[in-house]
Amino acid sequence: MQGTKLLKRITADPAIFGGKPIVRGMRISVELVLSLLAQGETTEDILHDYPDLEADDIRACLAYAHAVIADDTLEAVRVS
């Protein structure tokens, strides 16, 4: 699925999570999905734990994160 189509899966509604980006209007935030991936969860694990999600939703979260930071210059982040 192309990036533009994937990004249509990400929505923002001020009534849900204060307008944070969410997946297809559900109460599953992009932030949650990215956090789970960063913690080492696999796509299969996430789909098992959140059966309303589809594999393209997870790819959409990654595409959204890429779109957000694509033109940014990032500074080193220190993790303690």
Indicate where each model-derived feature is located.
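N-terminal first-folded block
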Residues: 1-28
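Short alpha-helical elements of helix-turn-helix
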Residues: 31
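Short alpha-helical segment immediately N-terminal to, or the first helix within
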Residues: 35-36
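A short, basic/aromatic helix-end/turn motif that makes direct DNA contacts
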Residues: 49-53
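C-terminal structural segments of small proteins and small subunits
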Residues: 55-78
